[in-house]
């Protein structure tokens, strides 16, 4: 996609949405729930509506200096905000608005790509795609600016794929009356490769996972197949139900028909809620999976503790409401409903072990994924292991956890 085409696409997509409703104002709450949200906001004292994933975004490929420049422009904006306490709630698509500033950074990378060739152009386009994806974060279904940003992210990703030295194929896997869109990443097509199915959480896209392949899996000649969770990204048309691993299960069962992968050597990686789905799949399809790794996954504790869910920041509650298709939210009812998402309540972590060795990791003090959840997963997995990552060395912690993850998969897939 040339710079001119990209600029035109951006203008076409966003022109109708100059006065689009700001993200934090999209989800409606019952009066009693609104009072609770006000209480939580006052207690937490956060300056941002969004949970800023600075280190995760840097690991995924955002330049840390550029990231801070974008956040500084948002924070210093003089434009009106939906909520003056939250810096990232600038209304209208212009300077200071979250989607605008991240899209602008994406455009800069896209422009740079136009001045480069081959691998350098490809990397600049992958960076552009990631910036567009962050522009849409946390990807609420009713957020028009986020939907347009996602179009740009997907377009830049496919353009980057064409210029890359690696082989990236967009697959359409039949499911129910539609198709699941997945991306297969390969070092070559000379022979079938071991493959890892990767899923992110409920507030990120499959196109965010490029660096996991380039910096980790490709070095070991392991293919990566990315799939969005139901209700997100390419899978947004599929509702999020208690059977939330069904898309990944359909993809797993279709692997035998893909000539580039060895369907006898399959691993799983799940981040955040994607980790919950991967553990679930490790019980449902244990004969087809060699190993599984989860990072920061909510498994039981948060779902079984309505009080904890009720105290979550608004962005997380907005995401849950959006994924479940709720137009008006009752937090008390929502927190009770979430118990059904616990893998213990569903009966998976209660009696028999899965044959799949699962490595369950999370950051020390993570409120969504406590160590007790990981211990439970490890206990119900043959040769399973729970690992706590020290938050004192969070930057190193990210790298350490990924190195551990790759080693875990390598031991099972490459022997």
From Swiss-Prot:
- What top-level branch of life does the organism fall under? Bacteria
* pH-activity profile: Optimum pH is 9.0-9.5.
> Under which EC number(s) is this enzyme classified?
3.1.1.1
Broadest EC class assigned to this enzyme:
hydrolase
- Keywords in UniProt for this one? Hydrolase, Serine esterase
InterPro entries (alphabetical) = AB_hydrolase_fold (IPR029058), FrsA (IPR043423), FrsA-like (IPR010520), FrsA_esterase (IPR050261)
Q: How does activity depend on temperature?
A: Optimum temperature is 50 degrees Celsius.
Protein's UniProt keywords contain Hydrolase: yes
Reaction catalysed by this enzyme: a carboxylic ester + H2O = an alcohol + a carboxylate + H(+)
GO MF annotation list: carboxylesterase activity
Q: How does it assemble?
A: Monomer in solution. Homodimer. Forms a 1:1 complex with the unphosphorylated form of the EIIA component of the glucose-specific PTS system (IIAGlc).
Q: What does this protein do?
A: Catalyzes the hydrolysis of esters. In vitro, prefers short chain alkanoate ester as substrate. Displays highest activity towards p-nitrophenyl acetate (pNPA). Has weaker activity towards p-nitrophenyl butyrate (pNPB).
Regarding protein family, the annotation reads: Belongs to the FrsA family.
Its recorded name reads Esterase FrsA
Species name: Vibrio vulnificus (strain CMCP6)
Q: Recite the lineage of the species.
A: Bacteria, Pseudomonadati, Pseudomonadota, Gammaproteobacteria, Vibrionales
């Amino acid at each position: 996609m040339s710079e001119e085409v990209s600029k035109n696409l951006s203008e076409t997509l966003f022109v109708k949405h100059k006065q689009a409703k700001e993200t934090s104002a999209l989800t409606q709450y019952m009066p009693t729930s609104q009072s609770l949200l006000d209480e939580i906001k006052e207690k937490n004292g956060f300056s941002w509506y969004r949970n800023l994933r600075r280190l995760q975004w840097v690991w995924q490929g955002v330049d840390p200096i550029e990231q801070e420049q974008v956040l500084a422009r948002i924070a210093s904006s003089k434009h009106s905000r939906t909520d003056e306490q939250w810096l990232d709630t600038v209304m209208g698509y212009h300077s200071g608005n979250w989607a605008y500033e991240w899209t602008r950074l994406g455009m800069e990378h896209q422009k740079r790509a136009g001045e480069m060739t081959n691998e350098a152009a490809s990397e600049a386009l992958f960076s552009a795609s990631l910036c567009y994806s962050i522009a849409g974060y946390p990807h609420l279904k009713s957020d028009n600016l986020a939907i347009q940003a996602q179009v740009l992210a997907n377009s830049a990703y496919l353009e980057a794929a064409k210029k890359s030295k690696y082989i990236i194929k967009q697959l359409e896997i039949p499911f129910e009356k539609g198709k699941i869109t997945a991306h297969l990443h390969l070092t070559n097509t000379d022979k079938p490769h071991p493959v890892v199915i990767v899923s992110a959480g409920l507030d990120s896209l499959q196109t965010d996972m490029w660096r996991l392949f380039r910096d980790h899996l490709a070095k070991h000649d392991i293919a990566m197949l990315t799939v969005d969770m139901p209700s997100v990204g390419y899978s947004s048309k599929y509702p999020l139900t208690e059977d939330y691993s069904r898309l990944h299960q359909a993809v797993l069962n279709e692997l035998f028909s893909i000539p580039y992968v060895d369907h006898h050597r399959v691993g799983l990686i799940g981040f955040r809620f994607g980790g919950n789905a991967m553990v679930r799949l490790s019980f449902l399809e244990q004969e087809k999976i060699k190993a599984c790794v989860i990072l920061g996954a909510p498994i039981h504790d948060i779902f079984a503790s309505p009080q904890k869910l009720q105290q979550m920041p608004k962005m997380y509650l907005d995401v849950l409401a959006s994924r479940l298709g709720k137009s008006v939210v009752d937090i008390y009812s929502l927190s009770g409903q979430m118990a059904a998402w616990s893998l213990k309540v569903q009966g998976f972590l209660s009696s028999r072990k899965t044959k799949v060795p699962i490595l369950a990791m999370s950051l020390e003090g993570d409120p969504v994924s406590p160590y007790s959840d990981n211990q439970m997963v490890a206990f119900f997995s043959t040769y399973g292991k729970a690992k706590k990552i020290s938050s004192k060395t969070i930057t190193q912690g990210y790298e350490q956890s990924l190195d551990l993850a790759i080693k875990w998969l390598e031991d099972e897939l490459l022997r």
